[in-house]
């Protein structure tokens, strides 16, 4: 008990971190849902998600420095992220369609490296200590108990829920959504039925790009406007998607919230040495989930004798 007490904060100390963790988890969920839908529709694990969002956020910051309207700048960030993602999908999607999953995922790392290089050339090399994105909603909020909750944090939670529910409804009740689900089950059969595969894939790439842009702007506000930091925050979203085995968007949402809260709990630890490991939380949780899933699969096979 003494060990646990020395590692984890008291409830009173943890409450502000809990709200922050839930807000971050909701944005991870938004990102994870985009990755799952794209993977189900195209078979591509989009590891450039974070880099695309970071690039859009930095462009938005640059526009605000040129006295653009702040909301228009953020809109440009989202549109730019969507265009980059769609362009990548349309140029390389067909070539990657028949390749192994590892090759598809690795190919997106090429886009990540290109964007990181561009961001370093355009922004990082000139110094970035004073760069920041501050949403107007940061200045508004309310007090819950003894915790200050910003409107931005509430919007993040709402966006995560709406994205998850809306995407689920889209996949289930719309023609395009059911086509995406059919492609996830059997791409070749879907193609033989006359389904316009390229159009469906374009919709998936476009939607994923929009979510990347939104996540990039919000995470730049919640965490930091730093190219490397934002690029690798995709790891938390990827972990949530892996916990859901790249299938269920609901499980992705729940897993992302858990990752956000666990990460916040570790970061709030009074033990400085322990708090330094908060970045490992997504890896550990994903590894545990995959081990449990694999164990269940082994038990099922042993029982059926298959």
Which residues does each predicted region cover?
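Pore- or pathway-lining transmembrane helices of multi-pass membrane proteins that form conduits
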Residues: 52, 96-120, 230-242, 255-258, ...
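Inter-helical junctions in multi-pass inner-membrane proteins, predominant
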Residues: 9-27, 170-175, 202-244, 264-280
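Single transmembrane alpha-helix segments in multi-pass membrane proteins
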Residues: 13-65, 88-103, 242-250, 292
């Amino acid at each position: 008990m003494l060990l646990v007490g020395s590692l984890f904060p008291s409830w009173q100390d943890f409450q502000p971190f809990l709200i922050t963790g839930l807000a971050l988890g909701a944005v991870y969920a938004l990102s994870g849902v985009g990755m799952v839908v794209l993977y189900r529709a195209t078979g591509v694990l989009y590891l450039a998600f974070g880099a695309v969002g970071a690039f859009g956020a930095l462009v938005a910051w640059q526009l605000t420095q040129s006295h653009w309207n702040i909301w228009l700048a953020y809109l440009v960030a989202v549109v730019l992220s969507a265009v980059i993602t769609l362009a990548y999908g349309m140029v390389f999607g067909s070539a990657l369609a028949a390749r192994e999953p590892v090759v598809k995922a690795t190919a997106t790392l090429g886009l990540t490296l290109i964007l990181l290089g561009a961001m370093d050339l355009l922004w990082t090399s000139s110094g970035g200590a004073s760069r920041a994105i501050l949403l107007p909603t940061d200045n508004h909020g309310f007090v819950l108990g003894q915790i200050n909750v910003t409107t931005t944090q509430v919007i993040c939670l709402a966006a995560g829920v709406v994205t998850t529910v809306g995407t689920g409804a889209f996949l289930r009740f719309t023609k395009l959504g059911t086509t995406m689900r059919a492609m996830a089950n059997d791409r070749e059969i879907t193609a033989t039925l006359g389904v316009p595969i390229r159009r469906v894939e374009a919709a998936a790439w476009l939607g994923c790009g929009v979510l990347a842009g939104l996540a990039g702007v919000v995470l730049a506000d919640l965490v930091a406007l730093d190219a490397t930091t934002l690029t690798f925050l995709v790891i938390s979203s990827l972990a949530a998607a892996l916990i859901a085995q790249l299938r269920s968007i609901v499980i992705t949402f729940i897993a992302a919230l858990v990752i956000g809260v666990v990460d916040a709990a570790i970061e709030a630890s009074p033990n400085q040495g322990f708090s330094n490991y908060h970045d490992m939380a997504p890896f550990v949780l994903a590894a545990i989930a995959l081990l449990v899933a694999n164990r269940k699969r082994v038990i099922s096979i042993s029982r059926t004798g298959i």
